[in-house]
């Protein structure tokens, strides 16, 4: 794929930003990875807002709080899905960009050489 000069400038600026904030990014990622957010749907009467269990609810709350601290509007769809919006002002478009992710993880098995939820960076 060939980038235009403007696109290349954007990629370069993003790379410089990431390099300048790498330590913060790694710290925040490690904090997130400490949640043992294994989906647990075994409870026939889950707590409201926690259909996938309490650990997934905890990581949802963490991400909702982080987005709020960063000034981003959020919406929690009863613990099934969350939405974090990057508001654009004075942008005339009907198109959105969506990043889809999940916050639950697979169970840790016995193949780990250290605690799966204690990231080492």
Residue ranges with predicted function:
Residues 3-54:
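N-terminal capping segment at the start of a domain
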Residues 93-121:
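Active-site metal-coordination/substrate-binding segment of hydrolases
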Residues 41-94, 118-119:
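A non-catalytic alpha/beta surface segment that caps or lines the substrate-entry region
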